[in-house]
């Protein structure tokens, strides 16, 4: 089956749904392809306290459901499918999905997001949202005056640890090596902070916790040399071993940086291909927040409208 559209949005997180809302209100009749994880990363987030408009915290899945309904109510067609292949060599752009549907689009907004790199250990997924996080800015507030562990040794880990000292009583970094890869200025700030301690040459083997109520109580760590294990008591575990953008579909077509994030024109969502725009975490390695993703989704829709009206 072949379907034609003016605007095709790939991805259904805050960026994709915001783009859909603005595109629909501009009478562009957008089609949005949900992807494998409808709603994006917020669907695995419990309490959301930093999205404007809500005096009390809201649940991530509920927030994304509201965005989805809003997008549909203003005229977006949302398709439960995922993209398998993209051809951006000429307009109309061609997109093939898992259901064997072929789309031809005059413009495309890429909102496929990014995902945290996880440890891949037992109980990590079990305590996701119940003490395990990959975003200190999002979840640090919930650990006021509590002990937390940060896993990692790069810029992300050090920055997360420094941020968490604003909330936690103690921050312990567990790193598998005997030195950090982080920038020297960040390391200097970290070593000067009395709230932070570092456990070198260790890896996290297991996250320990309770089931009623579900909560983290500590991490079991192992020395990479001696193989001895020990327990570090904590209420939260922040995994900071990097993020990876979901950009494999667009490789060798859209220009990306060394970390495979899509490069956009400064102050814009335009990519190197005219008529193709990118919004949200897929082009943002710095902020990675729902509100910034939504903002760039809005920008992409407005820029797509302007492009189509040329």
From Swiss-Prot:
Asked if the record carries the keyword Disulfide bond, the reply is: yes
User: GO biological process annotations for this chain's record?
Assistant: removal of superoxide radicals
PROSITE patterns assigned to the protein according to its UniProt record, in alphabetical order = PYRIDINE_REDOX_2
Q: Which GO terms describe its cellular component?
A: cytoplasm
Catalytic activity as recorded in UniProt:
[thioredoxin]-dithiol + NADP(+) = [thioredoxin]-disulfide + NADPH + H(+)
InterPro entries noted in UniProt: FAD/NAD-bd_sf (IPR036188), FAD/NAD-binding_dom (IPR023753), Ferredoxin-NADP_redctase_2 (IPR050097), Pyr_nucl-diS_OxRdtase_2_AS (IPR008255), Thioredox_Rdtase (IPR005982)
In the Enzyme Commission scheme, what number(s) does this protein have?
1.8.1.9
What the record notes about the co-factor is: Binds 1 FAD per subunit.
Q: Which Pfam families does this chain map to?
A: Pyr_redox_2 (PF07992)
Q: Where does this polypeptide localize?
A: Cytoplasm
Cofactor entry:
FAD
Disulfide-linked positions: 135-138
Query: In its keyword annotation, does this UniProt entry include Cytoplasm?
Result: yes
The similarity annotation says: Belongs to the class-II pyridine nucleotide-disulfide oxidoreductase family.
Q: Any other noteworthy remark?
A: The active site is a redox-active disulfide bond.
Query: What is the name of this protein?
Result: Thioredoxin reductase
User: Which organism does this record belong to?
Assistant: Rickettsia bellii (strain RML369-C)
